[in-house]
Amino acid sequence: MGQMVEDRFIRKALFTKITKNEQIDYKFNSKVTEHKKQSGYISVTLDNGKKLNTKLLVGADGRNSELANRAEIKKSGWKYNQSALVCAIEHEADHNGVAWQYFMPSGPLAVLPMTGKRSCIVWTEQNANAKAINLFDETRYTKILAARLGNFLGKFKIIGDRHTYPLELSIADRFIDERLALIGDAAHSVHPIAGQGLNAGFKDIAVLAHIIQDAHHRGEDLGSLGVLKRYEEWRRFDSAQLAYSTDLFNKLFSNENEALRLARNIGLKLLDSIPVAKRNIIKEAAGITGELPRLMH
């Protein structure tokens, strides 16, 4: 279905690529404080006072995107009464490269394999519980996690920092403005139950690159609304479909109604017995269905 890749490895690979490309001028620890549309370009002011001019500005500044706010791009959606508790563990048993997900009344608990005998835990709890658990010392936190996790990985200990963040669903009403394109969490934020937030962001990048390349070959203005509209039409419906599908799954699997639980179990067993349907769902979850941009072939 896919591979788990640690964030640090992705960052290192990207950094290696951009530092070897002389056509990329990169700036760290810089923030856009202002952007203004001009005739034929967009002017960007950084927090150090430096000004840059570009044909196209790409907003990848997260779900609280200041670029989107300044462009008056509103979002639709809602906050869940859930937060994700995230940590890494080192364990006795081998995970064999297999990811696990447990569905509990408070929300899913995912065990995602990392290198060696290590796994990443993404553990969903109601907001009040998550806030309390996050304040516990490591011994008590580990004890609560062990009660939910069971012993299939043997004894374990938490390594590194623990994090928590509130969960929400949001879709930007527009993914574009003149000379501005939103990607990733700046455009859409989904429940982590399907583990597709990062993949959706990568697909945004691949589609935008595809559109820009085609426009360049045609001699078109890369930041024009006509060009950027193609990106929005390709990605917005797909992103909304993913967001609402994950919302439905969260409601379905975080509900302990007996009739619903029985129907859910029957449905999963039926799906497991139909290989074609199972393969199609795996492809859908991996984001490799429908029209794919060149970078994803």
Q: Positions of the model-derived regions?
A:
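Conserved N-terminal helical subregion
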Residues: M1-R70, W78-S83
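Short, solvent-exposed loop/helix junctions and linker helices
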Residues: Q3-R8, L135, F202, N257
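Solvent-exposed, non-membrane alpha-helical residues enriched in polar/charged side chains
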Residues: F15-T19, W100, T142, A146, ...
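Structural motif
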Residues: Q38, P105, T115, I176-D177
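FAD/FMN-dependent oxidoreductases across multiple families
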Residues: N129-L225
